[in-house]
Amino acid sequence: MYYLSDLSHYAFFTYISVRAGFAFFIALCLSLFLMPKFITWAKAKNASQPIYEYAPETHKTKCHTPTMGGLIFISSAVIASLFCIKFDNIFAISALLCLILFCLIGLIDDLGKVLKKDNHSGLSPRMKLLAQIIAGLICILPLYFSSELSTELFIPFYKHPLFDMEIFAIAFWILVLISSSNAVNLTDGLDGLATVPSIFSLSTLGIFLYLSGNLNYSEYLLLPKIQGLGEVVIICAALIGALMGFLWYNCYPAQVFMGDSGSLALGGFIGFLAIISKNEILLLLIGFVFVLETVSVILQVGSFKIFNKRVFKMAPIHHHFEKVGWVENKIIVRFWMIALLSNLLALASIKLR
């Protein structure tokens, strides 16, 4: 779409905002159109979500709900992005690679579970970790060696970098990618629970990307100046549109789950955006709900192994609230509210520097 401007005297299609808008609506329409067809196909093939044997009783009724919906909304976002991005932008190409590779890892994991009808099948934790490390290196190393990406570490509410991580930045970035990917995966346990916070996180990071990629805005707001970063906003917009199309069918009661193909890809992509926009530390606030879910699992496992006692009735923490009697819809909406507030606070850091 960018190259259509070469065929006319107008620069309309060169604007990032215009192409982001087109990408959003293309992905939204694709997702809304393809998702019901996928649901019908998945039901016919019995490609449903295996339910964990210790899950709350209310989850037993979801055993026939189709999974792997992430494959559709990720594909919709990628197709829409390919129509709208500039192909000579290394940030945009690396971002698409991240989305595709982490989706493939999740898809392999999903297929193992669906084919064997066992929630413990799929990729082993060790194989999944290895695959995530390899995918992360494929996405990060080209940026590192091209010197397009700064290795300096920034913290929220402070305009200067703390220090230069140099070669150690690679290990830190891989940690961010893997942590973010698995955190969203842990959160995806209730209908729409991971979807809406992901939309909030993508929106917040998209704003940071746009501002940092614009030399005038970044200078005025004292943000890191990274030329070419704005192009990734188009992919953000496409993914938000695709997620909104998915949410139409994923909201309570869900007609389809995203599966690992969706959650691992979303988390990996959110982590990647935090890295290239230099918001690795602020990601703790941007993805606060994901952090909360992950910390609850770490506390539960650690406490049980060390003290033989559980901190929560069940982890991740959304299952704890189910066990104490909260209805599913109430948990979902309250977590959405927390995600919205944490992202608004993250955006406030733009001016508080």
Swiss-Prot record:
GO terms under biological process: cell division; cell wall organization; peptidoglycan biosynthetic process; regulation of cell shape
UniProt main location, coarse: membrane
EC number(s) from the headed UniProt entry: 2.7.8.13
Cofactor requirement: Mg(2+)
Record pathway: Cell wall biogenesis; peptidoglycan biosynthesis
Annotated membrane topology: Multi-pass membrane protein
Annotated InterPro entries: Glycosyl_transferase_4, PNAcMuramoyl-5peptid_Trfase, PNAcMuramoyl-5peptid_Trfase_CS
Pfam families cross-referenced by the UniProt entry: Glycos_transf_4
GO MF annotation terms: metal ion binding; phospho-N-acetylmuramoyl-pentapeptide-transferase activity; UDP-N-acetylmuramoyl-L-alanyl-D-glutamyl-meso-2,6-diaminopimelyl-D-alanyl-D-alanine:undecaprenyl-phosphate transferase activity
TM spans (from-to): 22-42, 65-85, 88-108, 129-149, 161-181, 192-212, 228-248, 256-276, 281-301, 330-350
Catalyzed reactions: UDP-N-acetyl-alpha-D-muramoyl-L-alanyl-gamma-D-glutamyl-meso-2,6-diaminopimeloyl-D-alanyl-D-alanine + di-trans,octa-cis-undecaprenyl phosphate = di-trans,octa-cis-undecaprenyl diphospho-N-acetyl-alpha-D-muramoyl-L-alanyl-D-glutamyl-meso-2,6-diaminopimeloyl-D-alanyl-D-alanine + UMP
A single Gene Ontology CC term: plasma membrane
Protein localization: Cell inner membrane
Alphabetical UniProt keywords: Cell cycle, Cell division, Cell inner membrane, Cell membrane, Cell shape, Cell wall biogenesis/degradation, Magnesium, Membrane, Metal-binding, Peptidoglycan synthesis, Transferase, Transmembrane, Transmembrane helix
Known role: Catalyzes the initial step of the lipid cycle reactions in the biosynthesis of the cell wall peptidoglycan: transfers peptidoglycan precursor phospho-MurNAc-pentapeptide from UDP-MurNAc-pentapeptide onto the lipid carrier undecaprenyl phosphate, yielding undecaprenyl-pyrophosphoryl-MurNAc-pentapeptide, known as lipid I.
Sequence similarity: Belongs to the glycosyltransferase 4 family. MraY subfamily.
Name this protein carries in UniProt: Phospho-N-acetylmuramoyl-pentapeptide-transferase
Native organism: Campylobacter jejuni (strain RM1221)
